[in-house]
Protein backbone atom coordinates (compact mmCIF):
# COMPACT_ATOMS: atom_id res chain seq x y z
CA UNK A 1 0.00 0.00 0.00
CA UNK A 2 1.31 3.38 -1.02
CA UNK A 3 1.41 6.12 1.61
CA UNK A 4 2.29 9.59 0.49
CA UNK A 5 5.33 11.34 1.87
CA UNK A 6 3.19 14.02 3.48
CA UNK A 7 1.08 11.50 5.39
CA UNK A 8 4.17 9.54 6.45
CA UNK A 9 5.90 12.66 7.75
CA UNK A 10 2.73 13.63 9.62
CA UNK A 11 2.54 10.26 11.34
CA UNK A 12 6.22 10.44 12.25
CA UNK A 13 5.70 13.90 13.74
CA UNK A 14 2.79 12.67 15.87
CA UNK A 15 4.86 9.76 17.13
CA UNK A 16 7.75 12.06 18.04
CA UNK A 17 5.49 14.48 19.88
CA UNK A 18 4.35 11.71 22.20
CA UNK A 19 7.96 11.05 23.22
CA UNK A 20 9.91 13.63 25.21
CA UNK A 21 13.43 14.67 24.37
CA UNK A 22 14.81 12.04 26.74
CA UNK A 23 13.08 9.28 24.84
CA UNK A 24 10.60 8.60 27.62
CA UNK A 25 6.85 8.87 27.11
CA UNK A 26 5.34 12.17 28.28
CA UNK A 27 3.48 12.16 31.57
CA UNK A 28 0.05 13.66 31.81
CA UNK A 29 0.11 16.86 33.79
CA UNK A 30 -1.42 15.96 37.11
CA UNK A 31 -0.33 19.22 38.65
CA UNK A 32 -0.90 22.75 37.52
CA UNK A 33 1.63 24.56 35.44
CA UNK A 34 4.18 26.28 37.64
CA UNK A 35 3.20 29.91 37.96
CA UNK A 36 3.13 32.74 40.41
CA UNK A 37 0.05 33.18 42.52
CA UNK A 38 -1.71 36.29 41.35
CA UNK A 39 -4.29 37.67 43.75
CA UNK A 40 -7.79 38.14 42.33
CA UNK A 41 -8.82 41.56 41.19
CA UNK A 42 -10.06 43.89 43.87
CA UNK A 43 -13.60 45.12 43.38
CA UNK A 44 -13.57 48.89 43.12
CA UNK A 45 -16.06 50.79 45.23
CA UNK A 46 -16.90 53.90 43.28
CA UNK A 47 -18.25 56.92 45.08
CA UNK A 48 -21.70 58.06 44.11
CA UNK A 49 -21.80 61.45 42.38
CA UNK A 50 -22.37 64.35 44.72
CA UNK A 51 -25.18 66.80 44.25
CA UNK A 52 -24.10 69.68 42.03
CA UNK A 53 -24.96 73.25 42.83
CA UNK A 54 -27.26 75.12 40.48
CA UNK A 55 -24.49 77.15 38.81
CA UNK A 56 -21.90 74.39 38.71
CA UNK A 57 -21.45 71.80 35.99
CA UNK A 58 -19.25 68.71 35.65
CA UNK A 59 -17.12 70.50 33.06
CA UNK A 60 -15.73 72.86 35.65
CA UNK A 61 -18.19 75.74 35.88
CA UNK A 62 -18.71 76.52 32.21
CA UNK A 63 -22.43 76.97 32.80
CA UNK A 64 -21.76 79.87 35.14
CA UNK A 65 -19.45 81.44 32.58
CA UNK A 66 -22.07 80.98 29.87
CA UNK A 67 -24.70 82.67 32.07
CA UNK A 68 -22.39 85.60 32.75
CA UNK A 69 -21.66 86.06 29.06
CA UNK A 70 -25.33 85.88 28.13
CA UNK A 71 -26.22 88.61 30.64
CA UNK A 72 -23.82 91.07 29.08
CA UNK A 73 -20.61 92.85 29.99
CA UNK A 74 -22.00 94.39 33.20
CA UNK A 75 -22.56 90.91 34.70
CA UNK A 76 -19.01 89.85 33.91
CA UNK A 77 -17.53 92.93 35.55
CA UNK A 78 -19.98 93.00 38.51
CA UNK A 79 -19.99 96.80 38.24
CA UNK A 80 -22.55 99.03 36.57
CA UNK A 81 -21.41 100.41 33.21
CA UNK A 82 -20.17 103.97 33.28
CA UNK A 83 -21.73 105.75 30.36
CA UNK A 84 -22.72 109.32 29.52
CA UNK A 85 -25.95 109.04 31.53
CA UNK A 86 -24.62 106.49 33.99
CA UNK A 87 -23.21 109.15 36.30
CA UNK A 88 -24.28 109.88 39.83
CA UNK A 89 -27.66 111.34 38.76
CA UNK A 90 -28.60 108.58 36.29
CA UNK A 91 -32.30 108.38 35.45
CA UNK A 92 -34.60 105.41 35.94
CA UNK A 93 -35.29 105.16 32.21
CA UNK A 94 -31.60 104.86 31.43
CA UNK A 95 -31.20 102.14 34.04
CA UNK A 96 -34.20 100.20 32.71
CA UNK A 97 -33.15 100.36 29.04
CA UNK A 98 -31.06 97.40 27.82
CA UNK A 99 -27.52 98.17 26.87
CA UNK A 100 -26.93 98.08 23.12
CA UNK A 101 -23.65 97.08 21.54
CA UNK A 102 -22.03 99.34 18.99
CA UNK A 103 -22.33 98.40 15.34
CA UNK A 104 -18.71 97.33 15.14
CA UNK A 105 -19.32 94.67 17.77
CA UNK A 106 -22.67 93.50 16.42
CA UNK A 107 -23.60 90.65 14.16
CA UNK A 108 -22.29 92.39 11.04
CA UNK A 109 -18.70 92.35 12.28
CA UNK A 110 -19.01 88.70 13.22
CA UNK A 111 -20.52 87.71 9.88
CA UNK A 112 -17.89 89.67 7.94
CA UNK A 113 -15.09 87.89 9.79
CA UNK A 114 -16.66 84.50 9.23
CA UNK A 115 -17.30 85.33 5.57
CA UNK A 116 -13.60 86.07 5.10
CA UNK A 117 -12.67 82.75 6.70
CA UNK A 118 -15.18 80.72 4.69
CA UNK A 119 -13.51 78.54 2.05
CA UNK A 120 -16.51 76.81 0.52
CA UNK A 121 -17.98 79.85 -1.23
CA UNK A 122 -19.29 79.77 -4.76
CA UNK A 123 -16.34 81.73 -6.16
CA UNK A 124 -13.80 79.46 -4.44
CA UNK A 125 -15.55 76.38 -5.83
CA UNK A 126 -15.46 77.81 -9.36
CA UNK A 127 -11.78 78.64 -9.12
CA UNK A 128 -11.00 75.18 -7.74
CA UNK A 129 -12.94 73.56 -10.58
CA UNK A 130 -10.90 75.48 -13.13
CA UNK A 131 -7.65 74.48 -11.44
CA UNK A 132 -8.57 70.80 -11.35
CA UNK A 133 -9.64 70.56 -14.98
CA UNK A 134 -7.84 73.30 -16.95
CA UNK A 135 -8.74 71.73 -20.32
CA UNK A 136 -12.46 72.10 -19.71
CA UNK A 137 -12.75 74.54 -22.61
CA UNK A 138 -11.75 71.81 -25.07
CA UNK A 139 -14.87 69.73 -24.41
CA UNK A 140 -17.61 69.54 -27.03
CA UNK A 141 -20.67 71.76 -26.94
CA UNK A 142 -21.20 75.21 -25.61
CA UNK A 143 -20.41 78.24 -27.72
CA UNK A 144 -20.76 79.06 -31.39
CA UNK A 145 -17.80 77.06 -32.61
CA UNK A 146 -17.07 73.36 -32.50
CA UNK A 147 -15.10 72.62 -29.37
CA UNK A 148 -15.78 75.55 -27.09
CA UNK A 149 -16.89 75.00 -23.52
CA UNK A 150 -20.03 76.34 -21.94
CA UNK A 151 -18.09 79.22 -20.36
CA UNK A 152 -16.97 82.12 -22.48
CA UNK A 153 -13.56 83.47 -21.64
CA UNK A 154 -13.60 86.97 -20.13
CA UNK A 155 -11.00 89.42 -18.92
CA UNK A 156 -7.37 88.29 -18.65
CA UNK A 157 -8.20 84.72 -19.63
CA UNK A 158 -9.52 85.99 -22.97
CA UNK A 159 -6.35 88.02 -23.57
CA UNK A 160 -4.13 85.05 -22.70
CA UNK A 161 -6.04 82.72 -25.02
CA UNK A 162 -5.56 85.14 -27.92
CA UNK A 163 -1.75 84.98 -27.84
CA UNK A 164 0.04 82.51 -30.08
CA UNK A 165 3.41 80.82 -29.71
CA UNK A 166 5.50 83.88 -30.51
CA UNK A 167 3.15 86.54 -29.20
CA UNK A 168 1.23 86.66 -32.48
CA UNK A 169 -2.54 86.72 -32.32
CA UNK A 170 -4.53 83.68 -33.34
CA UNK A 171 -7.39 84.02 -35.77
CA UNK A 172 -11.01 83.33 -34.81
CA UNK A 173 -10.93 79.56 -35.17
CA UNK A 174 -7.80 79.17 -33.08
CA UNK A 175 -5.36 78.10 -35.77
CA UNK A 176 -2.01 79.75 -36.41
CA UNK A 177 -1.61 81.00 -39.94
CA UNK A 178 1.25 78.90 -41.27
CA UNK A 179 3.62 78.99 -38.27
CA UNK A 180 3.11 75.32 -37.38
CA UNK A 181 3.14 75.61 -33.59
Curated annotation (Swiss-Prot):
Residues 1-23 form the signal peptide. It holds the Pfam family ANP. Residues 24-27, 41-43, 50-52, 59-159 form a propeptide. Disulfide bonds join 165-181. Residues 140-150 have a biased composition (Gly residues). The keyword Disulfide bond applies. Keywords: Cleavage on pair of basic residues, Disulfide bond, Hypotensive agent, Metalloenzyme inhibitor, Metalloprotease inhibitor, Protease inhibitor, Pyrrolidone carboxylic acid, Secreted, Signal, Toxin, Vasoactive, Vasodilator. Residues 104-114 have a biased composition (Low complexity). GO terms for cellular component: extracellular region. It is found in: Secreted. GO terms for biological process: cGMP biosynthetic process; receptor guanylyl cyclase signaling pathway; regulation of blood pressure; vasodilation. Residues 74-150 are annotated as: Disordered. Its main location: secreted. One of its GO terms (molecular function) is hormone activity. The modification Pyrrolidone carboxylic acid is found at residues 28, 31, 44, 53. Venom gland. In the N-terminal section; belongs to the bradykinin-potentiating peptide family. Bradykinin-potentiating peptide both inhibits the activity of the angiotensin-converting enzyme (ACE) and enhances the action of bradykinin by inhibiting the peptidases that inactivate it. It acts as an indirect hypotensive agent. Synthetic Cdt1a, Cdt1b and the short hexapeptide Cdt3 are able to potentiate the hypotensive effect mediated by Bk on the blood pressure of anesthetized rats. This is Bradykinin potentiating and C-type natriuretic peptides.
Amino acid sequence: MFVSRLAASGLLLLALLAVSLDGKPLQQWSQRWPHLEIPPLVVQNWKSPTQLQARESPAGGTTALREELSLGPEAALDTPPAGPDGGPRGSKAAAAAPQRLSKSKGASATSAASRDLRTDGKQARQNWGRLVSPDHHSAAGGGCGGGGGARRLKGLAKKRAGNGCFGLKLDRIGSMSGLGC
